């Protein structure tokens, strides 16, 4: 049985990607330290330039044929499309929930993960905090996930603050996309679902710009990507939001998508994690899309639920794949139940929600 490391374990084993670092050895910084100005160290440009192995005044790149650049990009992308045409898990939406899900899933090197993101820039709304401010507020105990990523933060009694939300998003993306079992297909939209015999079996894809212009162009047929599990993390309602659950409603697999209620942070974050689940066979819903399908309150500019909902979705996917996971006791390690289910009721209540 494989041993994996997760921030939802109280005594994590060594990570398969960083055997010298525990998930719990983060680097929280006291608030007062943050308020002290940081002075840069003067750099001696003369010494630096002298140590360089080349002369910047006559710098030249190695020559290359333009066709080689084209072939390298095309060949590698086509190989990725072939490789991930039939994959283990497709995560639709690369916001904070989708990225957290893919990060947790891909710790198991045997699980092949494709991420579909309609935007050129992944990250969803997690590049900034509320109202375009910089800081990201994360309520405890989700700070354990930040510890695992090695992120610095200012620690308060019940929450922590990252000085810029982009630090979280850029850090998790750099760690995630370096893994050999992960491929991000950005600027690609999931236009539809593959559904066979009452089970979701993949997604229908197209270039995002094509999807946005179907009414102005002639028919441009899509492509497909089969998957054993689809994780829908498309966010709240919008042109490309909540598309997974809206499609389930339109084909009659669920009854309604009532939409999220007015803001209530304390209720919202617990509910989003608790209600993260497999809504129909083959499809798990995570992040703010959960609020759309269940009529939960919106949570506003706090991000802990996105991270832990994504982690929970990952373990639901692992369970569906028959692999060790934190939900059925097969995962190695002592669990922090609050990080798996938050304010969780029993499985029957979640299934009926």
From Swiss-Prot:
Modification type 2,3-didehydroalanine (Cys): residues: 219
Q: Can you name one GO molecular function term for this protein? A: cysteine-dependent adenosine diphosphate thiazole synthase activity
UniProt remark on cofactor binding: Binds 1 Fe cation per subunit.
**Cross-referenced InterPro entries, in alphabetical order?**
FAD/NAD-bd_sf (IPR036188), Sti35 (IPR027495), Thi4_fam (IPR002922)
Name the UniProt key words of this record, in alphabetical order. Chloroplast, Iron, Metal-binding, NAD, Plastid, Thiamine biosynthesis, Transferase, Transit peptide
Catalytic activity, per the record? [ADP-thiazole synthase]-L-cysteine + glycine + NAD(+) = [ADP-thiazole synthase]-dehydroalanine + ADP-5-ethyl-4-methylthiazole-2-carboxylate + nicotinamide + 3 H2O + 2 H(+)
Q: Where is the signal peptide?
A: none
Q: Which cofactor does it need?
A: Fe cation
Q: Provide the record's note on post-translational modification.
A: During the catalytic reaction, a sulfide is transferred from Cys-219 to a reaction intermediate, generating a dehydroalanine residue.
Q: Where is the transit peptide?
A: 1-48
The primary location reported for this protein is plastid
| Biological process annotations from GO | thiamine biosynthetic process; thiazole biosynthetic process
Q: Under the cellular component aspect of Gene Ontology, which terms does the record hold? A: chloroplast stroma; cytosol
Question: EC no.?
Answer: 2.4.2.60
Where does this one sit in the cell? Plastid, Chloroplast
- Which positions bind substrate? 97, 117-118, 125, 190, 221, 236, 288, 298-300
Q: Which NCBIfam families did the record assign?
A: sulfide-dependent adenosine diphosphate thiazole synthase (TIGR00292)
Subunit details: Homooctamer.
Q: What does this protein do?
A: Involved in biosynthesis of the thiamine precursor thiazole. Catalyzes the conversion of NAD and glycine to adenosine diphosphate 5-(2-hydroxyethyl)-4-methylthiazole-2-carboxylic acid (ADT), an adenylated thiazole intermediate. The reaction includes an iron-dependent sulfide transfer from a conserved cysteine residue of the protein to a thiazole intermediate. The enzyme can only undergo a single turnover, which suggests it is a suicide enzyme. May have additional roles in adaptation to various stress conditions and in DNA damage tolerance.
Q: Which family does it belong to?
A: Belongs to the THI4 family.
- Protein name, please? Thiamine thiazole synthase 1, chloroplastic
Which organism encodes this protein?
Vitis vinifera
């Amino acid at each position: 049985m494989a041993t994996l490391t997760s921030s939802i374990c109280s005594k994590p084993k060594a990570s398969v990607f960083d055997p010298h670092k525990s998930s719990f050895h983060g680097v929280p910084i006291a608030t007062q330290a943050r308020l002290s100005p940081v002075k840069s160290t003067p750099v001696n440009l003369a010494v630096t330039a002298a140590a360089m192995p080349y002369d910047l005044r006559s710098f030249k790149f190695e020559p290359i044929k333009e066709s080689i650049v084209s072939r390298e990009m095309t060949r590698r992308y086509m190989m990725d499309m072939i490789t991930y045409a039939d994959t283990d898990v497709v995560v639709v939406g690369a916001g904070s929930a989708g990225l957290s899900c893919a990060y947790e899933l891909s710790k198991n090197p045997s699980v092949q993960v494709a991420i579909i993101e309609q935007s050129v820039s992944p990250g969803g709304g997690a590049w900034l905090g509320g109202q375009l401010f910089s800081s990201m507020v994360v309520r405890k105990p989700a700070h354990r996930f930040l510890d695992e990523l090695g992120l610095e933060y200012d620690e308060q009694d019940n929450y922590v603050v990252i000085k810029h939300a982009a630090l979280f998003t850029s850090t998790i993306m750099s760690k995630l996309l370096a893994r050999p079992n992960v491929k991000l297909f950005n600027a690609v939209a999931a236009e539809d679902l593959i559904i066979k015999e009452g089970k979701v079996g993949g997604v229908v894809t197209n270039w995002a710009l094509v999807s946005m212009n179907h009414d102005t162009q002639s028919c441009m047929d899509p492509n497909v990507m089969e998957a054993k599990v689809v994780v829908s993390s498309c966010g709240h309602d919008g042109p490309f939001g909540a598309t997974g659950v809206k499609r389930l409603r339109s084909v009659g697999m669920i009854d309604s998508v009532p939409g999220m209620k007015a803001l209530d942070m304390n209720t919202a974050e617990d509910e989003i994690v608790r209600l993260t689940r497999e809504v129909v066979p083959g499809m798990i819903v995570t992040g703010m899309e959960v609020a759309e399908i269940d009529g939960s309150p919106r949570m506003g500019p706090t991000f802990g639920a996105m991270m832990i909902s994504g982690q929970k979705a990952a373990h639901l996917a692992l369970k569906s794949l028959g692999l060790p996971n934190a939900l059925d006791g097969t995962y190695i390690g002592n669990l922090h139940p609050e990080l798996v289910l938050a304010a969780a009721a029993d499985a029957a209540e979640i299934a009926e929600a």
